[in-house]
Design a protein with these regions (language model features):
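Extracellular/luminal recognition modules and glycoprotein regions
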Residues: 19-82, 91-95, 99, 106-107, ...
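Short, low-complexity, Pro/Ser/Thr/Gly-rich segments in the mature regions of secreted, periplasmic
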Residues: 159-174
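Bacterial Sec-dependent signal peptides at the C-terminal "C-region" and cleavage site
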Residues: 12-20
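Sec-dependent N-terminal signal peptides
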Residues: 4-13
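Blade-loop segments of beta-propeller domains
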Residues: 85-87
Length: 174
């Protein structure tokens, strides 16, 4: 009987958890925990990232539907960042910045990239999924008009630990 109750509670808690975190664009939700959302260009799929205590939750799927992928990111375990600055001139007074946030699950890496081009050209965001840190399975641009970003230029991002793994899937302008 005790096992049945525990099993029932586990199902109930996972159902409640999956109901709470669905892929949404910012304009369509009032969830205060949403820190990033965007729609994949030429697709109906949406990426949402929620902040829950010290964790970031990556959610992928059709907007408002049950998530196809949920990853609970914990710093120093499976949640990391990387960044790069590229000087635009010899004086190094103008730079492009590239910011990357990584969610790692087993041998897969889910990478969201933000390229801040400071008006030189339009800023851009991409989603890349890699297997074994080298084989790129998915690499799509995010629709800039749908992006809600309260993540990349915040203390939350700055406090994330750096990724020390292989960086073959980072696309940089160097």
């Amino acid at each position: 009987m005790k096992k049945i109750i525990i099993f029932f509670l586990m199902i109930l808690s996972s159902t409640i958890f999956s109901e709470e975190y669905k892929p949404y664009l910012k304009k369509n939700t009032n969830n205060k925990n949403l820190v990033f959302s965007a729609q994949i260009k030429d697709s109906k799929k949406v990426i949402s990232i929620y902040k829950e205590n010290k964790k970031l939750i990556y959610v992928y799927g059709s907007e408002g539907e049950k998530a196809e992928k949920i990853i609970i990111g914990t710093t120093n375990k499976n949640l990391f960042k990387n960044e790069n600055e590229i000087p635009l001139n010899e004086n190094n007074n103008n730079k492009l910045t590239e910011n990357f946030i990584l969610f790692k699950v087993k041998n897969y890496t889910y990478l969201i990239s933000f390229y801040n081009n400071y008006g030189v050209k339009e800023n851009s965001y991409t989603l890349t999924v890699a297997k074994n840190d080298e084989e790129i399975l998915f690499d799509k641009e995010l629709d800039i008009s749908t992006v809600y970003d309260n993540l990349f230029n915040t203390n939350l991002f700055k406090k994330l630990p750096y990724d020390n793994g292989v960086v073959a899937y980072y696309v940089t302008y160097d």
